[in-house]
UniProtKB/Swiss-Prot annotation:
KATP channels are regulated by cytoplasmic ATP/ADP ratios; ATP inhibits the channel by closing the pore, while ADP activates the channel. Activated by phosphatidylinositol 4,5-biphosphate (PtdIns(4,5)P2). Changing A1184E: In PNDM3; uncertain significance; slightly reduced inhibition by ATP. It comes from Homo sapiens. Changing R1436Q: In HHF1; cannot form a functional channel, due to protein instability or defective transport to the membrane. This is ATP-binding cassette sub-family C member 8. It comes from the Eukaryota. Forms an heterooctamer with KCNJ11; four ABCC8/SUR1 molecules interact with one KCNJ11 homotetramer. The gene is ABCC8. CDD domains: ABC_6TM_SUR1_D1_like, ABC_6TM_SUR1_D2_like. Mg(2+) binds at S720, Q774. Residues 935-949 have a biased composition (Basic and acidic residues). ATP binds at W688, G716, S720, S721, S1482. It is found in: Cell membrane.
Length: 1581
């Protein structure tokens, strides 16, 4: 019909223009269409045909790269415009429906405006991405025309007295405002960019981040719609489904999010705080203020989003109330009174009374609410991640200045610092994530209670009181849960510590048959842990129970009380289901309360820890301004190292200042000797603890420049401490340390106002020192990276260093040569290899000063000689570099230019060897008896002989005799085998399997059939009862609705009351049953988790402890330990809660969809496409989430490892002056971890936004179909309310179902990995001989017969001993020697059946050891290994863990091992504590404890495998004599580290390539000129 636009009536109102065309409402509406048609006609050709030449576009790899001025405001105004236009369309449709005539002009212009608004934002987006602002002129014209036409319409409304009572008037006024603001935004773009009306446009460059192709995190740069919906993640998620995500895929962080940027922001906040605080305190309060100043704005933004989301969340209950109320009442057709040219306009009240309108408003409110909620989450987590990176960087920079005494003897450990980084920074991050709840929860509770009161009246206060009164109970449970978790963590840490010790010392445990002792030790701690876990499970189940039961209880009490005490009150479906939805909302903040309170408390504790750490003692070194001239003078060649430790807690000690004269007297003299001096200490007293007794006393020494200085002395006399004192690592009580000054280009003046000077002369900062510590410190990096150590790579120098340290054979055998990752702390290498790589690092550096702390301790004589000759002498001393060498190898003293002899922390004497010969005759003679000085020609001859006898390199260990390989043959075989398995720790294998259903089945089957049946049955029954409760509520409220009008004619009011009572009673029974089932299911889930955790850990421990030694050699220790740590923790604590959440969210979604389908079966038609979309979303998300979660974990490990490595190697890093380089690596590691965390957060938001949008669609479809059915099929209002309530439930739980599914998939990997280890075959502990047939005192003589013995480490490997025959008489002392790789250690291990004996026999005292049970065999022999192994615990436990020996026996063993005096001096004596790894004793003392441990056993056969490698020669000689006398009647087999130690043996066995080369008395072998043993002795002289 031609007149349908203005109305289909036959009268002429549409033509009436007698009062002017602008007074014709239809004409005005038609005029409003013109701007929209104009925009569509202008923009569509530009968008689809093509606009601008390609040359006018800026090509960049990101789509959205530039935001015009007012970008976010434009998007916000456009969204508001679209919403108002939707309301205008709906209002027009409703107004048009009042009369029979159709007036298209009531809603068609609004529809065109809606299309134009969408087109405008699409058009703007494309112009913005191409940076071509001139085309915005079309939008300028459009906004102008739209504003003018809409203003005309608004004015005409005013002229016809249409006001606020009509919704159309309000909407038109809003549109005028919005169009006007959009016009102003467009004018502002012209003002800023000057693309029109100005001669010179203003060019804007792309953001710096997006010019970097490596930046792929686009959240800060995309438009507002993409930010809110994470649309930019679509391509990333899609790509992740095709190929694994790695660090290259996620790229780099934007500059504003990098750790350095946030660290600078935090430092500025700290500085501002210090400026405000005159005292400059660094307490917890100052830290909180700095954090709020640096990151508070983003937190306010997150809180604003959260409050808006929570307020919008109340739209659900209100809309349910309106819809159900509309359907539950007989609504008369309303007739609006106001007309405009024959058209009726609805009022706002009439508009909101329409059920369909409410359904659409509910849909839009849900979309907006979910968007705001996810935006709040994202901003809070992003802020937390940025804060974490800033704090980690600040902690690291503090570590670089930390006093060494704090770590070695003082207040903190490396573990505490790592906990600060790994745990406390995360606590602060999660506090910032939960922080918006602190402001949002009170708002949500207050608004929720007000609305409940508005709907229910006084009854609402009953339910609210129930919830609020139970909140303290929840808090109490949460507190107990937190305590149980802390207790569990403590026991877990103790168990992991014991497991770690057990795994690191597994070789010793097996050799000593102590497996059961340490298994029992771990199981005892595990039982304590399980007790805590049981408490944790109980409180967790109570917490879960309360979360599900409190809403049921509140609803039960409220509704029953409502109908019982307020009989005239309204209990319609609208009231009931709106109240039910409000109760669910009201309970949420109270559930969060416990989490928020716990997180707040943890954050307060973490900040307190951080405050204590940041205020801990530092080593202050003056920073010198670069390129300042050096003052000339006689003392300018020296610089005093500022050793004073700044301790803010304690005043400086002055009581020891009198030990030396005034500081002026300590200035070095300006004579000729001083000119040649590199380091000089005068009157130095040094200590490790501020209040402790000086470790070094009255130290006055000089170290000559460009010469070799050796420091010698007995074990524990302070040699290593002297080096550290010179490096400034010890606390100086008094005295001064002077370093010769550096060239002007390398040093600078010190601008510090706190300069600590020894004199009035200028004090210089010392240069880098190449330092190799006694305990090798290696990075978790390649061999090459450990040697060059961030220095430029020089191939020639690198090869020279490799050759000098005899590393080439070791490199050849590694899987990837010198590019092999050697693992954290060098766990892939032997002690000797670690030592030589550490020394190689010092040799490679170009530093003028080199400190080497006992570099020969783990090396045999050949390697030591070669290192001394080719490395220290040729590479260092001949290059005129200053070398300070701490050593026990006195045979090298003739090479020293200067010797410093120490005794008991003091300097006994310093000078040349001739000086000692003249003035210290007794000491010199003592040395002479120990060293038997060798001449230069013989040393060269020995080295030449070694090279001549070396076989070709690159072969496997069993085939070659390479120098410097693993000190134990089994470790060498490990390297050979793993080379075939590609054991390069640098390559991370991606396993992208589907959901591990088998692991899930194994997990559930471990619980047992009864518990599993109870779990499944209780879960299903619980959700059936929950549905029954709500269904019965619908029937009850429907009956109340129909009863109300009938009650007027009811003769017997008792019947009505009886009917209500029946409904209330059934409702009470169902609710009570539901509460009971909630308790049963929560307890069952946690009990299942406990049972599975207990069973899997016990099986894992039993399997691992009984595994053969080959398993530990071919499986990385970290991998095994991870099964006991992270995987067991996942099974203990995470899988049960995830399983409960997954089952609950899945069953809730299924039951909700079932209820909706029951209420409106037509919903099933719409459900199918939504289900397909949901399936693909979860499918893509799970793959990306799994990869990102693994990437987040794997990027965190290097970060934590870097912290641990830095703390352990702090002395080395500071000695090298590499602080800045390590800080840069820290920033890289932090950024890598943060970018993975941010992508994971964005992926989670991507999922949740989509799933919640799908949930909103479910709500819309359910609402529309329910309303339609109710209007046409007489569907009861109660069922409509039921369907809508469950539709809201779907929108809440759908994303949790997918998230929990992804989490469960990831966590079941722990079960899969543990079950993989459970397949490991155990050693065959059973023997052919029954225990009763073995004499109790066997072996009582010590006679050993070796018959044609051939052994190998695995059936797939070649033999390491071939056809060995020997006869050892009882009580004989046998020495075994041979070059590295000759089979010495394999020979000793064969006695314990630690290797595969595939041919021959070993018969001890008439019994073939192959027939003995393993435990019996190993418990009857004794061995001492080269690497000392001590366990945390008492000295008594370390010597006698079986508790079989008396104290006198233990003291006797300590006396034999030269440790009796040391132990007696300790508090507690035998009960004194040995720390983990024996770190509170020196390396030599640890070895002596191992000797004492072997002496305690008093077996007839005693094997020493290079047991004295870490002991000085004097102590070694004493021990050898003691062994010979104390074990005169026992058979002793000694594998020689120094050949001279076996000269007194009865027989000597010389091995070569696994075969006996020589076997005779030592004097006979020495008498033969061609004897290999004789050549060894000559080389050892």
């Amino acid at each position: 019909m031609p007149l349908a636009f203005c109305g289909s009536e036959n009268h002429s109102a549409a033509y009436r223009v007698d009062q002017g065309v602008l007074n014709n409402g239809c004409f005005v509406d038609a005029l409003n269409v013109v701007p929209h048609v104009f925009l569509l006609f202008i923009t569509f050709p530009i968008l689809f045909i093509g606009w601008g030449s390609q040359s006018s576009k800026v090509h960049i790899h990101h789509s959205t790269w530039l935001h015009f001025p007012g970008h976010n405001l434009r998007w916000i105004l456009t969204f508001m415009l679209l919403f108002v236009l939707v309301c205008e369309i709906a209002e027009g449709i409703l107004s048009d429906g009042v009369t029979e005539s159709h007036h298209l002009h009531l809603y068609m212009p609004a529809g065109m405006a809606f299309m134009a608004a969408v087109t405008s934002v699409v058009y703007y987006h494309n112009i913005e991405t191409s940076n071509f602002p001139k085309l915005l002129i079309a939008l300028l014209v459009y906004w102008t025309l739209a504003f003018i036409t809409k203003t005309i319409k608004f004015v005409k409304f005013l002229d016809h007295a249409i006001g606020f009572s009509q919704l159309r008037f309000c909407l038109t006024g809003l549109l005028v405002i919005l169009y006007g603001m959009l016009l102003l935004v467009e004018v502002n773009v012209i003002r800023v960019r000057r693309y029109i009306f100005f001669k010179t446009p203003r060019e804007v460059k792309p953001p710096e981040d997006l010019q970097d192709l490596g930046v792929r995190f686009l959240q800060p740069f995309v438009n507002l719609l993409s930010k809110g919906t994470y649309w930019w993640m679509n391509a990333f998620i899609k790509t992740a489904h095709k190929k694994p995500i790695d660090l290259r895929a996620i790229g780099k962080l934007p500059i504003a999010m990098r750790a350095l940027t946030n660290y600078q922001r935090l430092c500025e906040a700290f500085d501002a705080q210090v400026r405000k605080d005159i005292q400059g305190t660094q307490g917890a309060r100052a830290i909180w203020q700095a954090l709020s100043h640096a990151f508070g704005r983003r937190l306010v933004l997150s809180s604003t989003f959260r409050i808006l989301a929570d307020l919008l969340g109340f739209a659900g209950p209100l809309c349910i109330f309106g819809i159900v109320d509309h359907l539950g009442k007989e609504n008369d057709v309303f007739q609006p009174k106001t007309q405009f040219l024959g058209v009726y306009f609805v009022s706002s009240q009439e508009f909101l009374a329409n059920a369909y309108v409410l359904a659409v408003l509910l849909f839009l409110a849900l979309l907006l609410q979910r968007t705001f909620l996810q935006a709040s989450y994202y901003v809070a987590i992003e802020t937390g991640i940025n804060l974490r990176g800033a704090i980690q960087t600040k902690i690291y920079n503090k570590i670089m200045h930390l006093s060494t005494s704090n770590l070695s003897m003082g207040e903190m450990t490396a573990g505490q610092i790592c906990n600060l980084v790994a745990i406390d920074t995360n606590q602060l991050m999660w506090f910032f994530f939960l922080c918006p709840n602190l402001w949002a929860m009170p708002v949500q509770i207050i608004v929720g209670v007000i609305l409940l009161y508005y709907i229910l009246g006084v009854s609402a206060l009953i339910g609210a009181a129930v919830i609020i009164l139970l909140a303290p109970v929840q808090y109490f449970v949460a507190t107990k849960l937190s305590q149980a978790q802390r207790s569990t963590l403590e026991y877990s840490n103790e168990r992991l510590k014991q497991t770690n010790e057990m795994l690191r010392g597994i070789k010793l445990l097996k050799l000593y048959a102590w497996e059961n002792i340490f298994r029992t030790r771990v199981e005892t701690t595990r039982r304590k842990e399980m007790t805590s876990l049981r408490a944790f499970a109980i409180y967790t189940s109570i917490s879960i129970f309360m979360n599900t039961a409190i809403p049921i209880a509140a609803v039960l009490i409220t509704f029953v009380g409502h109908v019982s005490f307020f009989k005239e009150a309204d209990f319609s479906p609208s009231v009931a289901f709106a109240s039910l939805s409000l109760f669910h909302i009201l309970v949420t903040p109270l559930f969060l309360l416990s989490s928020v309170v716990r997180s707040t408390v943890k954050a307060l504790v973490s900040v307190q820890k951080l405050s204590e750490f940041l205020s801990s003692a530092e080593i202050r070194e003056e920073q010198c301004a670069p390129h300042e001239p050096t003052p000339q003078g006689p003392a300018s060649k020296y610089q005093a190292v500022p050793l004073r430790v700044v301790n803010r807690k304690r005043p400086a000690r002055e009581d020891c200042r009198g030990l030396t004269g005034p500081l002026q007297s300590l200035v070095p003299s300006a004579d000729g000797d001083a000119d040649n001096c590199c380091v000089q200490i005068m009157g130095g007293y040094f200590t490790w603890t501020p209040d402790g007794i000086p470790t070094l006393s009255n130290i006055t020494i000089r170290i000559p420049r460009g010469q070799l200085t050796m420091i010698v002395g007995q074990v524990g006399c302070g040699k290593s401490s002297l080096l550290l004192a010179a490096l400034g690592e010890m606390q100086k009580v008094s005295g001064a340390v002077f370093w010769s000054s550096l060239p002007d280009s390398e040093i600078g003046e010190d601008p510090s106002p706190e300069r600590e000077t020894a004199t009035d002369l200028d004090i210089r900062k010392r240069g880098p020192v190449a330092y190799a510590s006694q305990k090798p410190w290696l990075l978790n990096a390649t061999v090459e990276e450990n040697i060059i150590f961030e220095s430029p790579f020089n191939k020639q120098r690198y090869k020279m260093v490799i050759e000098a340290c005899s590393l080439q054979p070791d490199i050849d055998i590694l899987p990837h040569g010198d590019q092999t990752q050697i693992g954290e702390r060098g766990i892939n290498l032997s002690g000797g290899q670690r030592q030589r790589i550490s020394v190689a690092r010092a040799l490679y550096q170009h530093a003028n000063v080199v400190f080497l702390d006992d570099p020969f301790s783990a090396l045999d004589i050949h390697l030591s000689d070669h290192l001394m000759q080719a490395g220290i002498l040729e590479l260092l001393r001949d290059d005129k570099r200053t070398v300070v060498l701490v050593t026990h190898k006195l045979q090298y003293l003739p090479h020293a230019d200067w010797i410093i002899a120490m005794k008991d922390g003091t300097i006994q004497r310093e000078g040349t060897l001739k000086d000692f010969q003249r003035s210290e005759c007794q000491l010199f003679e003592h040395w002479k008896t120990l060293m038997n000085r060798q001449d230069q020609e013989l040393e060269k001859e020995t080295v030449t002989e070694r090279k001549a006898t070396e076989p070709p390199q690159g072969l496997s260990r069993a085939m070659s005799s390479r120098d410097g390989l693993l000190q134990d043959e089994e470790e060498e075989e490990e390297e050979a085998a793993e080379s075939e398995e590609d054991d390069n720790l640098s390559s991370m294998l991606h396993q992208r399997a589907e959901i591990p259903w088998r692991a899930c089945a194994k997990y559930l089957s471990s619980a047992g059939i009864l518990l599993l049946s109870l779990l499944v049955f209780s879960q299903l029954l619980k959700h059936m009862v929950l549905v029954a409760i709500d269904y019965w509520l619908a029937k009850w409220t429907d009956s109340a609705l129909t009863l109300t009008p009938a009650a007027r004619n009811c003769s017997l009011s008792q019947e009505c009351t009886l009917d209500q009572t029946v409904y209330a009673m059934v409702f009470t029974v169902l609710c009570s049953l539901g509460i009971v089932l909630c308790l049963v299911t929560s307890v069952t889930v946690e009990w299942t988790g406990l049972k599975v955790a207990k069973r899997l850990h016990r099986s894992l421990l039993n399997r691992i402890i009984l595994a053969p030694m080959r398993f530990f050699e071919t499986t990385p220790l970290g991998s095994i330990l991870n099964r006991f740590s992270s995987d067991c923790n996942t099974i203990d604590q995470h899988i049960p809660s995830t399983l409960e959440c997954l089952s609950r969210s899945t069953l809730l979604c299924v039951s909700a969809l079932a209820v909706i389908s029951y209420v409106t079966p037509v919903f099933l038609v719409a459900l199918l496409p939504l289900a397909i979309v949901c399936y693909f979303i979860q499918k893509y998300f799970r793959v990306a989430s799994r990869d990102l979660q693994q990437l987040d974990d794997t990027t965190q490990l290097p970060l934590l490892s870097h912290f641990a490595e830095t703390v352990e190697g702090l002395t080395t890093i500071r000695a090298f002056r590499y602080e800045a380089r390590f800080q840069q690596k820290l920033l890289e590691y932090t950024d890598s971890n943060n970018i993975a965390s941010l992508f994971l957060t964005a992926a989670n938001r991507w999922l949740e936004v989509r799933m919640e949008y799908i949930g909103a669609c479910v709500v819309l479809i359910a609402a529309v179909t329910s309303i339609s059915n109710s209007l046409h099929r007489e569907l009861s209002a109660g069922l409509v309310g039921l369907g809508l309530t469950y539709a809201l439930m779907v929108s809440n739980y759908l994303n949790w179902m997918v998230r929990n599914l992804a989490d469960m998939e990831l966590q079941l990997g722990a079960v899969k990995r543990i079950h993989g280890l459970l397949k490991t075959e155990a050693e065959s502990y059973e023997g052919l001989l029954a225990p009763s047939l073995i004499p109790k005192n066997w072996p009582d003589q010590g006679k050993i017969q070796i018959q044609n013995l051939s052994v190998r480490y695995d059936s797939s490997l070649k033999p390491v001993l071939k056809h060995v025959n020997a006869l050892i008489a009882p009580g004989q002392k046998i020495g075994i020697c041979g070059r590295t790789g000759s089979g010495k250690s394999s020979f000793s291990l064969a006695f314990f059946r630690m290797v595969d004996t595939f041919e021959g026999h070993i018969i001890i005292d008439g019994i073939d050891i192959a027939k003995l049970p393993l435990h019996t065999l190993r418990s009857r022999l004794s061995i001492i290994l080269q690497d000392p192994v001590l366990f945390s615990g008492t000295i008594r436990f370390n010597l006698d863990p079986e508790r079989k020996c008396s104290d006198s026996t233990l003291w006797e063993a300590l006396e034999i091992a030269q440790l009796k005096l040391v132990v007696k001096a300790l508090p507690g004596g035998l009960d004194a504590i040995i720390t983990e790894g024996g770190e509170n004793f020196s390396q030599g003392q640890r070895q002596l404890f191992c000797l004492a441990r072997a002496f305690v056993r008093k077996t007839s056969i005693f094997i020493m495998d290079e047991a004295t490698a870490s002991i000085d020669m004097a102590t070694e000689n004493i021990l050898q004599k003691v062994v010979m006398t104390a074990f005169a009647d026992r058979t002793v087999v000694t594998i020689a580290h120094r050949v001279h130690t076996i000269l007194s043996a009865d027989l000597v066995i010389v091995l070569k390539r696994g075969a006996i080369l020589e076997f005779d008395k030592p004097e006979k072998l020495l008498s033969r000129k061609d004897s290999v043993f004789a050549s060894f002795v000559r080389a050892d002289k």
